[in-house]
């Protein structure tokens, strides 16, 4: 159970970072 919780927590963090990075690059105008 702890492993699954840690996995989902890591997945959520990675998704949040990726989204923030994509939005940041989009605002700058690189994409």
Swiss-Prot record:
Keywords: Chloroplast, Electron transport, Membrane, Photosynthesis, Plastid, Thylakoid, Transmembrane, Transmembrane helix, Transport. Pfam families: PetL. It is a single-pass membrane protein. GO terms for molecular function: electron transporter, transferring electrons within cytochrome b6/f complex of photosystem II activity. InterPro entries: Cyt_b6/f_cplx_su6. It comes from the Eukaryota. It is found in: Plastid, Chloroplast thylakoid membrane. GO terms for biological process: photosynthesis. Its main location: plastid. The chain crosses the membrane at residues 4-24. One of its GO terms (cellular component) is chloroplast thylakoid membrane. Component of the cytochrome b6-f complex, which mediates electron transfer between photosystem II (PSII) and photosystem I (PSI), cyclic electron flow around PSI, and state transitions. PetL is important for photoautotrophic growth as well as for electron transfer efficiency and stability of the cytochrome b6-f complex. Belongs to the PetL family. The 4 large subunits of the cytochrome b6-f complex are cytochrome b6, subunit IV (17 kDa polypeptide, PetD), cytochrome f and the Rieske protein, while the 4 small subunits are PetG, PetL, PetM and PetN. The complex functions as a dimer. This is Cytochrome b6-f complex subunit 6. It comes from Humulus lupulus.
